[in-house]
């Protein structure tokens, strides 16, 4: 019995020149996601996925490495300009934005979108070390 030969079409990567970089920086980790204007993810990277474990995940250097990895993958889509949306109280916010700028991505705007409660839920108790 002869096998049927199927011709497979190669998936062509779409070209996106303007993108949005979402940087979520918590006290423990930093997540960098680069999306198109509609919100479809092009690339993402985390400081934990970049090889940092434990308390080193929350460092500014780990956030810088994560932003560089996300920018490298986004460059394959032809991304040139990024709007940056920063969320969270972590230490990797500034270094992630600087890393995107250093990777030849033109940062057009930086917006802080950290959610602030209008006195909603009770916060966690203070740590006693």
UniProtKB/Swiss-Prot annotation:
Keyword Nuclease: yes or no?
no
The species this protein belongs to is Francisella philomiragia subsp. philomiragia (strain ATCC 25017 / CCUG 19701 / FSC 153 / O#319-036)
Q: Which family does it belong to?
A: Belongs to the universal ribosomal protein uS11 family.
Q: For this chain's UniProt record, which GO biological process terms are given?
A: translation
Q: Which gene encodes it?
A: rpsK
Keywords for this protein? Ribonucleoprotein, Ribosomal protein, RNA-binding, rRNA-binding
Its quaternary organisation is: Part of the 30S ribosomal subunit. Interacts with proteins S7 and S18. Binds to IF-3.
Upper classification of the source organism reads:
Bacteria, Pseudomonadati, Pseudomonadota, Gammaproteobacteria, Thiotrichales
Q: Which GO terms describe its cellular component?
A: ribonucleoprotein complex; ribosome
Q: Provide the protein name.
A: Small ribosomal subunit protein uS11
């Amino acid at each position: 019995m002869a096998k049927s030969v199927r011709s497979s079409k190669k998936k062509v990567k779409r070209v996106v020149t303007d993108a949005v970089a979402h940087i979520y920086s918590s006290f423990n980790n930093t997540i960098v996601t680069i999306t198109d204007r509609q919100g479809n993810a092009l690339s993402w990277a985390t400081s934990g996925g970049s090889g940092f474990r434990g308390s080193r995940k929350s460092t500014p250097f780990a956030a810088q490495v994560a932003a560089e990895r996300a920018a490298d993958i986004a460059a394959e889509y032809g991304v040139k300009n990024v709007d940056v949306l920063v969320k969270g109280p972590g230490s990797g916010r500034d270094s992630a934005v600087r890393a995107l700028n250093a990777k030849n991505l033109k940062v057009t705007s930086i917006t802080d979108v950290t959610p602030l409660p209008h006195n909603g839920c009770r916060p966690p108790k203070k740590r006693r070390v």
